[in-house]
Amino acid sequence: MPKMKTKSSAKKRFRVRPGGTVKRGQAFKRHILTKKTTKNKRHLRGAVSVHETNMGSIAQMLPMAGL
């Protein structure tokens, strides 16, 4: 059986919190920001948790995370 390998793109985008939830960054905050309102950009700040429907695919991409 081959080694289980972590997806490099996933380990750069996700962090596992101590409680077992996964933290991710918000999308739509990199470029073309002039046409977005200040309120919209403010709501995109910070990190949010990955939704439980996506946790299965995250667990496959991060096999060593113990999800």
Swiss-Prot record:
Gene3D superfamilies: 4.10.410.60
Ranges of compositional bias, category Basic residues: 1-16
InterPro entries: Ribosomal_bL35, Ribosomal_bL35-like, Ribosomal_bL35_CS, Ribosomal_bL35_sf
Source taxon at top rank: Bacteria
Pfam families given in the database record: Ribosomal_L35p (PF01632)
PROSITE patterns: RIBOSOMAL_L35
Location of region: Disordered: 1-24
Gene Ontology, cellular component aspect: cytosolic large ribosomal subunit
Alphabetic keyword roster: Ribonucleoprotein, Ribosomal protein
One record GO biological process: translation
A GO term, aspect molecular function: structural constituent of ribosome
Recorded family membership: Belongs to the bacterial ribosomal protein bL35 family.
NCBIfam families: rpmI_bact
Name assigned to this protein: Large ribosomal subunit protein bL35
